[in-house]
Amino acid sequence: VDSSQLGHPRRVAVGLEQNRLAMLLAVLHRHGGLMLGDQDVFVNVVGGVKVAETSADLALLLSMVSSFRDQPLDRELVVFGEVGLAGEIRPVPSGQERLREAAKHGFKKAIVPKSNMPKEPITGMKVIGISRLSEALEHL
């Protein structure tokens, strides 16, 4: 995310559907209060991977917020959740397994949909359950 020098800011998505990026930016503006209308936005998914699963929505939005604010995300943070048009955070399949696997890989903090909160605590990991995009932004 960077200030645009052009009349129409660019939206470039590599590894993510262009329409998904446009929808996520609209939700971020409406329910996150971030004005990115005059910003160029570039999203590049590492390793040539194509993100088709909506569970990456929240992580993508938080990475864009991180870039816009020039505040890096915590390296020990894992994030997942589908973002709806009304700013709600929807659960994703296999949430418990995702958290356990993230903990095995050294992640110490997670921001996830409330419905994906673990039934039992995960050793060494603080899990934050959210239901709205605005709540996720408060935890950055």
Residue ranges with predicted function:
Residues 1-140:
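Peripheral, non-AAA+ core regions of ATP-driven protein-machinery
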